[in-house]
UniProtKB/Swiss-Prot annotation:
Organism annotation: Amoebophilus asiaticus (strain 5a2)
Pfam families xref list: EFP, EFP_N, Elong-fact-P_C
Protein's recorded name: Elongation factor P
SUPFAM superfamilies in UniProt: Nucleic acid-binding proteins (SSF50249), Translation proteins SH3-like domain (SSF50104)
Function, as annotated: Involved in peptide bond synthesis. Stimulates efficient translation and peptide-bond synthesis on native or reconstituted 70S ribosomes in vitro. Probably functions indirectly by altering the affinity of the ribosome for aminoacyl-tRNA, thus increasing their reactivity as acceptors for peptidyl transferase.
Family indicated by similarity: Belongs to the elongation factor P family.
Cellular compartment(s): Cytoplasm
Cellular component terms (Gene Ontology): cytoplasm
Amino acid sequence: MATTSDFRNGLCIEFNNDLYTIVEFQHVKPGKGGAFVRTKLKSLTNGKVIDNTFNSGVKITTARIERKTYQFLYKDGAGYHLMDNNTFEQLDLDEKAIQNPLLIKEGQELDVLFHQETGNFIGCELPPFVELKVTYTEPGLKGDTATRALKPATLETGLQIQVPLFIDNDEIIKIDTRTIAYVERVKTDI
């Protein structure tokens, strides 16, 4: 058990029969009345973010979450297949269990979350950035880099995103997994 004074970003709590992580919190002491804590909570089961206010000093049940690194092996009709690199134990996941499945490619590592007391699977977390190869995009015009113009590009996983005009086919680009947006071109050693 913890109280609202123990709140910190990333803390996992049990609230309304669900598991949540604290995304943001603010301790408020108004001039009149008791203190309270405003929070933004993200559900670990469905990814929804809710706002909630706790009275100061309220006891909250914390949840212990275990993170394990798994390697993505392959995808087939049954779902996504991952392997624990330490024990070589395989885990089969439904497509809904991965937040953005088009951002992962074979051999990539993911963090898999388990509830420590029950051992139940909670979810997957992608790394903040991934590097993917551009398989198709229209050719850009030479010298047209002064503006922030974008064009569509198809990546090796089938994902389509907007990239700057200077990106060509077979280039590797870095993508932010939180916003699913182009970040930069990856420099390759030739």
